[in-house]
Amino acid sequence: MLNFEAIIETGDQVIQQISFDLQHISSVLNTELFDPFEVCCYRGGNYWELESAEEFSGDDESS
């Protein structure tokens, strides 16, 4: 015979753990968003990786 009370209790624990994990993932994503324009610039139809923010000021871009 199945013990439905134990199954439901285990399910509740799993749901709580998943909820906690999702909240943690969400908080990490909110604090560590990746902005490609902090490390790349778009010039001549290509993205170029920058060594530093000073390397590209945006003033010399030609279209």
From Swiss-Prot:
Species of origin: Avian infectious bronchitis virus (strain UK/183/66) (IBV)
Name of this protein: Non-structural protein 3b
Pfam families: IBV_3B
